[in-house]
Regions:
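Peptidyl-prolyl cis-trans isomerase
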Residues: 71-112, 146-147, 188-233, 268
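PPIase-associated folding chaperone regions across multiple families
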Residues: 1-64, 106-184, 208, 228-310
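An amphipathic alpha-helix/helix-turn recognition signal
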Residues: 64, 68-71, 181, 202
Length: 310
């Protein structure tokens, strides 16, 4: 069934006009906004009594906290209007928490409802009351992810530490030895490619032969439409280096997820990320509708033989 479903998803294609129309009808789902805000908490904190039990604040204490939050928020708003930076304004108040959102997304709360309003202009500043809390919000810009995604191939030489005892005296020595071994293997693989045909196809053959990445070692190590932040930091930074050109190769090392050495081949740029996001959303919507249509008229019945099963 999964192959049948995937075949249907893969068959879905959309014209540029259809993608643009869907985007324009669902901008909030795809746009990102650059804004800052200061959060002023309008409720009092709970405390502990002598026995360590939690004591909730009284109505009077909460009312006082809200009054203080309102006063501080209004004062901060005025200070920012007069030219003080948001972060510095927040620092003037114990209950003011500053947040910078250079690529904020819409969530439907009071702040993002204001930020993502179509009428927003650069430099707009406001005070928002939401429940017991207050927010001073400064808007900078809004737009879609216009940068191009990238296509890359890679060969992973994984540093396997699953059988090592991190508390053992010789742990670091063994770890360093395994790192050195995998680094040497990565360098040897790149050298083999450089001494061969030096083509994308020859790199793909090596990936199928050598890569420890089970997610790509049957398709030549290929990842398409990679977006910023999708891969581990070192991999990401190499792929999105502004100087990167088709046919570039390199080796990066990362720790954590997929610890090891990545031999990378840069295939080239692909569709803008916003288009990738929109197409994926359209596919998800169409697949859901298709799947619902498949099962809506199905009625489950229990065969008589089921009663004999124990």
């Amino acid at each position: 069934a999964s192959h049948y479903q995937q075949d249907y998803i893969d068959s879905l294609t959309y014209t540029d006009e259809e993608v643009a129309t869907y985007y324009n009808e669902h901008k909030n789902n795809f746009d990102v906004a650059d804004y800052e805000y200061i959060y002023f908490k309008g409720t009092a904190d709970s405390t502990k009594d002598a026995d360590g039990n939690t004591v909730e604040p009284t109505d009077e204490e909460n009312a006082a906290a809200k009054e203080a939050a309102s006063a501080n928020a209004n004062a901060a708003l005025e200070a920012v209007r007069n030219g003080l930076l948001m972060e510095k304004a927040a620092g003037n108040y114990d209950n003011g928490t500053y947040t910078d959102r250079p690529t904020g997304t819409y969530s439907g709360d009071a702040v993002t409802e204001w930020v993502f309003n179509e009428e927003r202009q650069e430099g707009d500043l406001t005070l928002i009351e939401s429940g017991d809390n207050y927010y001073v919000v400064l808007f900078h810009s809004r737009g879609r992810n216009d940068y191009n995604t990238v296509d890359v191939r890679h060969i992973l030489f994984k540093v396997d530490t699953s059988d090592l005892d991190s508390k053992a005296d010789d742990y670091q020595e063994k770890l360093d030895a395994r790192k050195a071994e995998q680094k040497e293997a990565a360098e040897a693989a790149l050298k083999k490619w450089e001494e061969g045909a030096r083509t994308e196809d020859s790199f793909a053959e090596l990936a199928n032969e050598l890569s420890a990445d089970t997610g790509s070692n049957t398709n030549g190590g290929l990842y398409t439409e990679v977006y910023k932040g999708q891969m581990v930091t070192e991999f990401n930074d190499w792929c999105f280096d502004e100087s990167r050109q088709p046919g570039d190769t390199g080796i990066v090392y990362n720790e954590g997820s997929y610890t090891g050495y990545h031999v990378i081949y840069f295939v080239g740029t692909d569709a803008p990320y916003w288009q990738v996001q929109v197409r994926n959303a359209m596919k998800n919507a169409d697949y859901t509708q298709w799947n619902n249509d498949l099962v809506k008229d199905i009625t489950a019945t229990e065969a008589s033989g089921m009663k004999y099963l124990v």
